[in-house]
């Protein structure tokens, strides 16, 4: 026992030792505790033994048992026996499972992202327009609230356009002596515009004009009568026996005085004529000796108790007015505050209380005189502004709208019949010498004598001889006559004595004659061209002629230099023109301009007129420094220097209106208290004339003078031209002809409608108004039919430059013009309002009173209607009183929701707004919002009614305008009624004929200049009169500080307005940095903004460009189109929607092929990652370098050979790289000019294959296509053409689709249980997807749309965005055959059920010409008569009876089909009658709807039909004049007609 125990202990020790060495420390048995009992030791070893046994067992199972079992299982042999049927079933099951997995998991991957796609976040353009509009309205409200914090009087004065551009010093000079006058509700103001300039500060003033006895207005116009025209009780005012007609209502902040009256306030008082001028304005005869009328206390009018307002010591008493002179002394203009009725509760009664009154501010006459004396250049700016208003507002309205052009031309008739003109003849020796040289023995020689060639060439011996003579006599004072050079001249005193043309007041200088002076040529060319005399370009001073006296002995010489006959002639002509224009050297305005330095003195220069302030000993005289016009009409300097804070005085006299109603009108009139009518003008004269060299002015004018000779019946100026100039008739006469504007008149009859107005004789001037005012020529100027004419011509550009240089001439010229204007024109000018509406401003709101209508002078307005009946607009008038703040008072931004607004259209330049509401005395039906900074001329209702009574032709013309608008509206309504259902996804048509186009880049570095050049060339090619403006070209006209100074805004606005008058389209090129003022100007001036972007720039596509951010901050209302520039005609699928996703300010987009030259180090544009390229680069990096270099060499050789092959193919005669009719810039130009060509392809199943042939014929004949729309099969062919714009790809893809649809097996496998449809639509869907892929409609190169029938909402939907295959499939979904496409919860079917030929929708897109191809089945209109009952057996027998006379009765399927296409048939008939539609229907009636297997046959039917038709049209001249097919720019320039297209074969 002991031995066994020891043996176990030894074994345990050995195992313990072994395990301790083998097992890790964590599994090793722990050492026994020292000094333990044997019992514990035994237990310890037993536990350890059990643990060891468990470990060994586990190791045995893992290492031995499990592997042995696996080996035994693998070594077992067994057999499975299956029969053939089991194997086939198993294989069928496996194949079916695999097919279902591939079919429904992988092959339907094209539609996994298109189940309910909302066009990737693209917002409806109409909604974005309204959203931006409301933002603009909120911005306007914020701006208006900010403006109200300023001084109200300064705000009113700054808002007036005349004073808005002046410097602060000039502005303060005008306003420091301004006074105010308060009027009670019963006071009538006698408005004397010669006392000062008045502005309404508070309240509303009603302005009345006097009605003369011989006027038609007074006849039968009784205010007590219930007259239709007199629906306002305040239209007529009676003072004494004089009747006054309401002219206008002037609101707070608007000028009460006429802006033309500023000319009288600025005119210096230098003669007694001022007194007569003032009295003449009140019809007081100059023969009346006003000084004999005693000045006594004011007396009452014939009606008792009427006085001239409150008595004031500063106002002199009025004279006694004798009864015989009463009617002459009634003022022309009176004004009174407008009554405002308010309801007031007094106890139990309701009373109407009239709370009214007004406050006016007056800038006195003396303030204008101080400005005229101290700031002559600022005076010229005011005069320029007055003329600009006269041109833009008055003349435009009178000529274009009212049709009173003859009234305007009466001023030129007066000019040429005044005594000053009759005395403005040339000296006899100059006149005879000129006639002797032009009308020689050979007759009239009309040789064109260029100004440059006159002094660069020597053409005869006589000229050389003359040159020698002149060089020897440089210091002579003789006038060298050309007659002395003739060998046959016998000589006389005039040829040997000194001659002078100097008058008593002209200081003259002479000029040496050039060697090749045209006046001394021995012979003139005989060609019928213009002959002109030009002056040397030297800066030497010239002589002037005395225009009144012919006594040569009284003349002296002006200089030490010799005066030639040419210089004498030129100066004499200039002096004659000056006398006609009203420019006199003796005038006070000329004497005040001492030390004048042309173009160098600033507006506020303190040295202007400095010599007037110096005494004889060159010391400053404080007394002389005072303004010489401190008193006027009895007003002392203390009276006129009352500040604004002083107590208001009675500046104007008034009478109490209440006394008018209490007085009994009698026949006798004893007197009237009008104190301002008889005041005499007293002005201090400067006795010592100042030194001023007026000869420089005449010399510079003479340099620009051209003497021309025209033959008989030669048109010199065409009506409507801009660059006419001033024509002074030296000999002969000019006929002034006028052609009434009639847009519907054929051009061949326009020549017959020319009517002669008057003739300009010798000594007269033609082209006066167009030169002085800057207006386009209203008449045609032509020489007489019997003989020619010799004229002296100053071009309009030269005249404008000289007037800008010598700005002090503008005041006398403008004053002379005002005297020539008729009283009717001045009345119209006084009543017309010049409205300035900023971008986003509201011209008028829906619901406003229509108290006037507007004519758009510049800018653009968007018409918006609120569809909610709960909206009520303001009841205030819709007028905009000359400044932006008043226009915002009717802004309904807080009451308008986006969903309630509807954009109806836009008004552009020259269009009129609101006549219907005015004639019907109703409220505004729409709201008008300015798209950009705009200007309108407002004609008040009262002025229109007054002019209509005196000139019935105005009412006739306005009635025609209104009737034409009504007819046009009826046409639109008729077209909308023809389409029974209104499309749910399109807005009303907005005209694309934009006046101004802005080209703006998204980021810097884009080729803006190159893009603009190509677009301008395209616009010219389609026949548009276009000009491109960039900062450099604009600075050329306006100066280098055009966009930095406040004054430049006036010139800038006038320059842009002039360009809008002269050109059809203006392209603004934004080629400046982001913070430049020109960038903001371009954005604010654009009717349409073209936003350029690089299509491959992913950074900008997902973000926003710097220029776009500025565009958003400026809150422009203009339409914004995104132009994506591509290096080639290819758009990566899905790339366009990335650009349009977040750009809600973009309403459209265009794909343009244009190469962008990028710099090598440019990293701003990131290319899209290409998986294959990245994989190739990774593999190439790990490849052996030798293999890599070999492959690179092979690749380079392949590329070079491909380039050579492509080059030879491109330059071959059978192919042309860029076809002109596919020019993207011509397409863009047509769209922007409303000249787009649309292609509409109808539905018809397999018959639509003929569309491919027709498109091929269009390509062959070079007919461009700008817009494409389609239905059913037409949507498929149209989508292919819009996607690739290539006939080759269209043919191949359409044929591929036809083969798939015609496949019988594909149709059989696609059959399903016919609950909704016979087939599932899978094969049909996949066939469409195979040719379109994941391309979206936005990716199509040409703008495209297709229509579908929404059977959920019972509407027709138009699709212009989204996956193309999906909506094309929806447009082709024939009910019963294919299931509807589900989109956003709606079911979409074939669009042919509502409109199988969507011409109306294409018309909404702005297409002018529409090529509509109809391939639908022919309508069976056979009459049926089978009685009231019908037996099915009889119908069956009738079908099989060959002898039956009854037509076959349709079955149930046919009836359902006809019922489904009822709306489409009506829409087709309306489409045929639409203007501009080219209706085509190829002979395809013999083909069924599903005959897709006959592709080639149907294709050739369409091709042959269209090819023959277009060829015959081209041969017979019936093809419409589509813009771009012929280069109209070259035709205008006189080149031969060049066709831009050529035939191209496939």
Curated annotation (Swiss-Prot):
Subcellular location: Endoplasmic reticulum membrane
CDD domains: CAP_ED
Locus of motif DGA/G: 1390-1392
Residues in compartment: Lumenal: 67-81
Record-listed E.C. numbers: 3.1.1.5
The reaction(s) this protein catalyses: a 1-acyl-sn-glycero-3-phosphocholine + H2O = sn-glycerol 3-phosphocholine + a fatty acid + H(+)
One GO BP annotation of this record: glycerolipid metabolic process
InterPro entries cross-referenced by the UniProt entry: Acyl_Trfase/lysoPLipase, cNMP-bd_dom, cNMP-bd_dom_sf, NTE, NTE1_P-loop_dom, PNPLA_dom, RmlC-like_jellyroll
Topological region Cytoplasmic: 1-45, 103-1546
Annotated ranges, domain PNPLA: 1239-1403
Position of sequence motif GXGXXG: 1243-1248
Role played: Intracellular phospholipase B that catalyzes the double deacylation of phosphatidylcholine (PC) to glycerophosphocholine (GroPCho). Plays an important role in membrane lipid homeostasis. Responsible for the rapid PC turnover in response to inositol, elevated temperatures, or when choline is present in the growth medium.
Protein name: Lysophospholipase NTE1
Gene: NTE1
